[in-house]
Amino acid sequence: VQDHVIHFYHLHALDWVDITSALSADAAATSALAKSISDWPNSSQTYFQAVRDRLQTFVDSGQLGLFANAYWSHPAYKLPPEGNLLAAAHYLEALDWQREVIKMHAILGGKNPHPQTYHLGGMSIPDDPNGQHGIFPGRIAQLRNLANQALEFVQKVYLPDLLLVASFYKEWAGLGQGVGDYLAYGDFPIDTSGDPATLWLPQGLVFGKDLSRPPQPLDHNQIREYVTRSWYTYTGGDGAAKHPWDGETEWAYSGPQPPFDFLDTDGKYSWLKAPRYGNTPMEVGPLARMVVAYAAGHARVREVTDQVLAHLGVGPDALFSTLGRVAARGIETLVIAEKMLDWITELEANINSGNVAMHNGDLWDPSTWPDQAMGWGISEAPR
């Protein structure tokens, strides 16, 4: 939730939003625009006038920092000045919002990024229903309050802004198509069985942009890594493909000595191996997760996706595009932000029922391990 909002406003929005154009926006018209798409309280003429003045002071300072080297006023920017001022205001609000939201990471994970409480068999943070440490009733209340704040911002700021911006860039619904094949590992199991069918976000593969059929099941044995264009060598040569648990990481740098301007992409040019499913490159990430969920019949994902497509007046093929990837992050953010409140309620119910187990120590002692073993694990990254 936090990652997609930050990606939209702080890592990606300036591809669509011209900050300099916001300086010529009419504050009253911006207020009217904001109120036409959301009932977010920070929508008054006075508010947008203050934001515009703040931006003007920043520009007049001459110290533009990361905003100094950009394509301001480029004709490819489509938003009107009022849309740019609205987005700029929410860029600033999102900075404050994410500072609050990541308190959930600190409560459950110790820090952000890179949580510190995960370890073999569970988590190190205890359930403490009768104390003041770990997860206790006050912490549950704090988590619920933060989750509600997160959901409100997603519903009233992020999604309306995303739809507003997308409505001015509909041509991008036909641009940026990838390979057309999608893989999602799935996430958020509803029990401890390990059965992929119990994943709240489903697992599977969609080939050929086909949303009419259920996703194909994942077979981890089909995952392969190539080093044909990578600075490594494999036993068996560059044409060999290896499952990660059979993988080799033998450095063999053959690129130019620095400084250099270009890499020869017809040869080896990267430290990254090239993963394939069988011999097929697959798209992963937010769009892949939403495509697989849609094809799998995930009710809420289908509902929100259909609403977004209808609002923009585009068909399902628009998902497989640059615009589709932007929309997919918003769709995923909303459905997970909604679900977070359910998960907090479930955690509270577990604690109230006396189920305070946070760790399974059956395999904690190395003396219980076999002399040799092979295993595999899969997980998703937000972006």
Sequence positions of predicted segments:
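Active-site bordering "gate/hinge" segments
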Residues: 1-382
